[in-house]
Design a protein with these regions (language model features):
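Conserved Rossmann-fold cofactor-binding substructure of NAD(P)-dependent oxidoreductases
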Residues: 61-74
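Rossmann-fold scaffold of SDR-type NAD(P)-dependent oxidoreductases
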Residues: 11, 76-85, 130
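Hydrophobic positions on the long internal alpha-helix
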Residues: 80, 110, 114-118
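Catalytic loop of short-chain dehydrogenase/reductase
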Residues: 99-104, 108, 112-113, 127-146
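Conserved glycine-rich Rossmann-like NAD(P)H-binding loop of the short-chain dehydrogenase/reductase
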Residues: 28-44
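Conserved mid-core segment of classical short-chain dehydrogenase/reductases
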Residues: 84-101
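Conserved glycine-rich cofactor-binding loop
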Residues: 7, 14-15
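Rossmann-fold cofactor-recognition segment
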Residues: 49-64
Length: 146
């Protein structure tokens, strides 16, 4: 995939897989916009990335904020959703319903909102990548992670 001069938007790009994706995309010549939910984590991530990488605050659990974000940024060529929803972790039978609802609202509805807002801007050659964690491939005995 050719990334030079392509706009890559990474939702949840301040740590882990998202930050690594931002670093690799920028090194390949992409114009990168990454998002974070807090100014502190966003600034920390940007400090370790090329100056060409743009950071945007985004709480994708808030529909109005997603709409503002989608209207403010340049149309993406590629969209990567890599946000963590580590708000529900532990033995499944012991997880609080409210924690599960928050996790589902973030990971499922948050991703859905961003895709709904930006998919129409993607070119035919564009892509949408949804990143999951290790728990999607191999269970950890006695735990459930959302």
């Amino acid at each position: 995939m050719e990334l030079r001069d392509r706009h890559v938007v990474i939702v949840g790009g301040t740590k882990g897989i998202g930050a690594a994706t931002a670093r690799l995309a920028a090194a390949a010549g992409a114009r990168v916009t990454l998002t974070g939910r807090s100014r502190t984590s966003l600034d920390a991530a940007l400090a370790g990335l090329p100056q060409s990488v743009v950071g945007e605050l985004l709480d994708f659990t808030e529909p109005a904020l997603v709409a503002v974000f989608a209207g403010r940024i340049a149309a993406p060529d590629h969209l990567v959703l890599s946000a963590s929803s580590a708000v529900a972790w532990g033995a499944f039978a012991e997880l609080a319903e409210a924690a599960l609802e928050r996790a589902f609202a973030a990971k499922f509805w948050g991703y859905w909102r961003v895709i709904q807002a930006l998919a129409g801007q993607l070119p035919a050659s564009g892509s949408i990548t949804l990143v999951t964690g290790a728990a999607a491939r191999a269970a950890l005995p006695g735990t459930a992670g959302l």
